[in-house]
């Protein structure tokens, strides 16, 4: 059993090291994790530091250097073409995994629950709503999950058979929302119809765990983005 994991890096060697070390420490999996690094060159010297660090670990099966980055969706699309496993984790360099994450449990959820296409690892205790959108706690095959209103780019594990044929490598730094606009076109012009139940049917996006589940990671990159 294999999971492919992309670390999305952008000229921030200090953050990259914290992120990678946290993954090595806290990811728990009985199978193989195939690590891949995408380095977007926003600063040549800092990116070279990132690459030297990655190469020193002998951890990454693939190290891709993008000299002219066109946005995060394009970066992800480049790596998706190299994914071999049925499950894919996208992890940004500015997220630190702060507690153990059982990937065997995630795979079991995917295998037993065909409606689940994405599991997001929350950055804070899972709340009952987000921006006025009311979440729903569900239980499938003994696992408690909470609906998520969007396709989350990071940090999350994806069902490749669902997302790969739908993926659009939208250019620009608002590509996440453009991508979601494509995936959520059924609600375009009718946002009132976007309920937790309809998200389950259309997207299959969930937070791992019930309402109140403690956060799995912290975001370190506030005001540290070099993207323009």
Model-derived regions: residue spans:
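Active-site nucleotide-sugar/metal-binding loop of Leloir-type enzymes
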Residues: 77-87
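Short beta-strand/loop segment that forms part of the nucleotide-sugar
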Residues: 31-44, 64-65
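Short beta-strand-to-loop element that shapes/binds the nucleotide-sugar donor at the catalytic cleft/hinge
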Residues: 117-133
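Conserved donor-nucleotide/metal-binding helix-loop-beta segment in metal-dependent transferases, i.e.
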Residues: 100-122
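C-terminal catalytic/acceptor-binding lobe
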Residues: 18, 151, 155-161, 165-228
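Short, acidic, metal-binding catalytic loop of nucleotide-sugar glycosyltransferases
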Residues: 21-32
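Short beta-strand-to-loop acidic/aromatic patch adjacent to the donor-nucleotide binding site
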Residues: 86-96
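N-proximal low-complexity "stem/linker" segments adjacent to membrane-targeting elements
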Residues: 1-21
């Amino acid at each position: 059993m294999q999971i492919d994991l992309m670390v999305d890096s952008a000229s921030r060697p200090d953050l990259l090291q914290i992120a990678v070390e946290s993954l090595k420490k806290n990811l728990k999996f009985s199978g193989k994790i195939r690590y891949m690094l995408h380095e977007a060159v926003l600063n040549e010297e800092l990116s070279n530091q990132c690459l030297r660090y990655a190469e020193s670990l002998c951890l990454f099966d693939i190290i891709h250097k993008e000299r002219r980055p066109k946005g995060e969706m394009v970066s992800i699309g480049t790596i998706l073409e190299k994914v071999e496993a049925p499950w894919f984790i996208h992890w940004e360099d500015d997220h630190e995994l702060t507690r153990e994450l059982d990937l065997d449990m995630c795979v079991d959820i995917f295998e037993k629950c065909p409606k689940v296409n994405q599991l997001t690892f929350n950055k804070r205790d899972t709340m009952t709503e987000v921006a006025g959108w009311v979440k729903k706690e569900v239980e499938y095959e003994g696992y408690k999950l909470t609906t998520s209103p969007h396709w989350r780019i990071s940090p999350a594990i994806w069902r490749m058979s669902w997302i790969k044929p739908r993926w659009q490598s939208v250019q620009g730094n608002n590509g996440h929302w453009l991508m979601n606009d494509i995936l959520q076109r059924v609600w375009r012009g009718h946002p009132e119809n976007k309920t937790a139940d309809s998200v389950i049917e259309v997207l299959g996006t969930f937070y791992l765990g019930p309402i109140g589940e403690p956060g799995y990671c912290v975001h370190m990159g506030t005001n540290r983005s070099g993207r323009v």
